[in-house]
Design a protein with these regions (language model features):
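Von Willebrand factor
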Residues: 74-120, 131-134, 157-165
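…and closely analogous acidic/polar surface helices at protein-protein or active-site interfaces
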Residues: 12-13, 23-63
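Von Willebrand factor A/integrin I-like adhesion domains
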Residues: 81-87, 160-210
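Surface-exposed acidic, glycine-flexible loop patches that form ligand/cofactor-binding
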Residues: 5-9, 54-58, 106-118, 141-144
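Cysteine-dense, membrane-associated helical/juxtamembrane modules
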Residues: 13, 219-233
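VWA/integrin I-like adhesion module and closely mimicked acidic/polar interface patches used
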Residues: 93, 129-180
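Residues that scaffold, gate, or flank divalent-cation-dependent active/transport sites
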Residues: 20, 128
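Short coil/turn segments at secondary-structure boundaries
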Residues: 12-14, 28-33, 78-82, 135-139, ...
């Protein structure tokens, strides 16, 4: 399948995950799910554990790296179990300092292979809200001036349409950037345009969306964003 081929084509690319551990992540992710309510923090854990296998297929040589917004420590991940241990005793609290965490990654100041390394880097940002240390205009300027070898996907961990729309409006159109909604919302949007979206393909979009425009355009009408060759089915 095309998705597998695309993932294999970026094998060896370094991947880092910036995970939101701010206090707002303690809110219920889906208020309509009264049978099995989960917080955004719990959903982030589950998503990252599921993503781990796919990320390790791509960044297989030295694992991928995870950093939390309110903890400067970088964690090197080599297995799904490593991800699980990250959350032992860890609570979501604090603010949303996206600017402070993203600036070194976007500028090349910090890279898994060393300062100012020129190899490609995929940055996955899992967050639920507005940055607390930079405005959306400031975020747009910062992301817009990133190194061309850095690709960014924002994975939205919120049901708040206003927040998702703010990210879409300010950064989604920047080159090398994608906004990926939660699976249920993204699936609904993709299917509204006559396409299908499995959970596996949604995870692939999260990894590939910033680098490969056809994944960024999955939730647009057929023919948008470059024609039929960009349609993922």
């Amino acid at each position: 399948e095309d998705v597998v081929r695309d993932l294999l084509s970026i094998a060896g690319t370094d991947i880092v995950v910036v995970a939101d551990d701010s206090g707002s992540m303690n809110q219920i992710a889906d208020p309509t799910n009264t049978m099995n309510p989960k917080t955004r923090w719990e959903e982030l854990q589950e998503t990252l554990i599921k993503l781990a296998h796919l990320l390790l297929v791509v960044d297989h040589s030295d694992g991928f790296h995870v950093q939390f917004l309110n903890d400067p420590t970088w964690h090197e991940i080599h297995s799904k179990q490593h991800v699980e241990t990250l959350f032992y005793g860890r609570q979501a609290r604090g603010r949303t300092p996206l600017g402070a965490r993203l600036r070194p990654l976007l500028s090349g100041q910090w890279h898994p292979k060393g300062h100012s390394n020129e190899t490609e880097l995929i940055v996955l940002v899992m967050t639920d809200g507005e940055p607390s240390d930079v405005t959306f205009d400031g975020l747009r300027q910062m992301v817009g001036s990133k190194k061309p070898s850095v690709f960014v996907t924002f994975l939205m961990c919120t049901e708040d349409d206003d927040v998702v729309e703010a990210y879409n409006r300010h950064v989604d159109r920047l080159p090398g950037v994608d906004i990926t909604d939660d699976y249920v919302s993204e699936k609904r949007e993709v299917e509204a345009h006559g396409k299908r979206l499995s959970y596996y393909k949604w995870m692939a979009k999260a990894v590939l969306g910033g680098k490969m425009p056809k994944y960024d355009h999955m939730d647009e009408k057929k023919g948008a964003g470059g024609g039929g060759c960009c349609v993922v089915s």
